[in-house]
């Protein structure tokens, strides 16, 4: 999405500009196993990038699967690359699929069967998945999910200074990390996890799989 605007930045740089460093220990009754994350909520990452680079972020949602596809199809046909939020479990190029509805990709094209996406370097960069699987991924309900969320980025009349943006992002990230709103986030969340993790051996129904999945998510 940024390259379309003439902005060339690496994944690590975008993570920093998105004020992405964080920690969360998340457990709900509806979850089979607690979730451990090493970054901020994915929604905020995109918002922070747009804020620090003086870009306009347009986010939309709809409960209609057909409308959700028609909307992004129209944008793609007009030459606009679109960001999508979805559950990566359904993406056919994932070698080890797990349910995580806070995953983001960019879609830049499609044909009668497949959608052409850009994912992280870890997941292969330029990839494809069937239109059917994409629809399932976008409409999935559950923790961290949204209603077929999609977004676009556009330039404003304000240019950005990268050095200033980096400095501000680091300050903001440090401030948020040192002042978590609840005790299961940031450094307080790490402390809480250190005590809660010992209980997992007694509550997990599949210790090997649950611990392996947790480690993979952190990586």
PLM region descriptions:
Residues 2-9, 20-158:
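Conserved active-site-adjacent core of cysteine acyl-enzyme catalytic domains
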């Amino acid at each position: 999405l940024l390259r379309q605007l003439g902005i060339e930045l690496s994944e690590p740089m975008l993570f920093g500009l998105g004020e992405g460093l964080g920690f969360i220990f998340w457990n709900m009754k509806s979850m089979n196993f607690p979730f451990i994350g090493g970054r901020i909520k994915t929604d905020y990452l995109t918002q922070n990038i747009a804020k620090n680079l003086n870009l306009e972020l347009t986010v939309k949602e709809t409960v209609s699967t057909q409308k959700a596809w028609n909307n992004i199809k129209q944008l793609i046909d007009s030459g606009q690359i679109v960001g999508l939020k979805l559950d990566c479990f359904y993406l056919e190029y994932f070698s080890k699929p797990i349910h995580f509805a806070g995953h983001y990709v960019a879609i830049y094209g499609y044909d009668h069967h497949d959608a052409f996406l850009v994912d992280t370097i870890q997941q292969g960069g330029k990839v494809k998945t069937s239109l059917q699987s994409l629809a399932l991924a976008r409409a999935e309900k559950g923790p961290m999910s949204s209603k077929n969320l999609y977004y676009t980025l556009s330039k404003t009349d304000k240019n950005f200074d990268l050095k200033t943006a980096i400095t501000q992002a680091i300050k903001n990230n440090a401030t948020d990390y040192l002042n978590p709103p609840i005790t299961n986030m940031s450094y307080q969340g790490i402390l809480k996890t250190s005590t809660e993790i010992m209980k997992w051996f007694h509550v997990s129904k599949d210790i090997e799989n649950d611990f392996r999945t947790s480690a993979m998510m952190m990586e």
